[in-house]
């Protein structure tokens, strides 16, 4: 799907003109981009969370030569889908209280981040019942 496809969808479903639809879509993407550039998290209920994470500089290895190389510190964008989206992708009924499950996942992810760890969602499935 492209940005043009999204604009077309807004045009067809909402009834705005194509110009208005394009302006709305551009505004949404600009807002998302600015939020992420500030380092703020984006939480979209029933869809997922976008977050910018800081990666530390580290020593890596060139796979072709085996030579060690410095990989500089950088910011990376991560996306964690909600339980509702994961269920939809797997053809399952959405969880009864997806907001509660999303909140538990978010709390677990925040706790892992505070400890300097990556969040592993696989363990969360046991908590979902």
UniProtKB/Swiss-Prot annotation:
GO cellular component assignments: cytosol
Feature: compositional bias, Basic and acidic residues: 95-117
Amino acid composition bias (Acidic residues), ranges on this chain: 118-129
Any one Pfam family match given in the protein's UniProt record, by short name: Bac_DNA_binding
Domain of life: Bacteria
GO biological process: DNA recombination; positive regulation of metabolic process; regulation of DNA-templated transcription; regulation of translation
Keywords: DNA recombination, DNA-binding, Transcription, Transcription regulation, Translation regulation
Region: Disordered, residue numbers: 87-129
GO molecular function terms noted in the UniProt entry: DNA binding; structural constituent of chromatin
PROSITE patterns linked to this entry: HISTONE_LIKE
InterPro entries to which the protein is assigned, alphabetical: Hist_DNA-bd, Histone-like_DNA-bd_CS, IHF-like_DNA-bd_dom_sf, IHF_alpha
Family indicated by similarity: Belongs to the bacterial histone-like protein family.
PANTHER family, per the entry: DNA-BINDING PROTEIN HU, INTEGRATION HOST FACTOR SUBUNIT ALPHA
Function (record text): This protein is one of the two subunits of integration host factor, a specific DNA-binding protein that functions in genetic recombination as well as in transcriptional and translational control.
Subunit structure: Heterodimer of an alpha and a beta chain.
Protein name, as recorded: Integration host factor subunit alpha
């Amino acid at each position: 799907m492209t940005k043009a496809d999204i604009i077309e969808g807004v045009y067809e479903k909402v009834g705005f003109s194509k110009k208005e639809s394009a302006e709305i879509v551009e505004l949404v993407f600009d807002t998302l981009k600015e939020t992420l550039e500030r380092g703020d998290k984006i939480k979209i209920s029933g869809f997922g969370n976008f977050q910018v994470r800081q990666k530390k500089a580290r020593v890596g290895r060139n796979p072709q030569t085996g030579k060690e190389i410095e990989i500089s510190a950088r910011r990376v964008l991560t996306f964690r889908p909600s339980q509702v989206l994961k269920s939809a992708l797997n053809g399952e009924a959405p969880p009864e209280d997806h907001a509660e499950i999303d909140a538990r996942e978010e709390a677990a992810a925040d706790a892992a981040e505070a400890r300097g760890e990556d969040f592993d969602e696989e363990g969360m499935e046991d908590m979902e019942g």
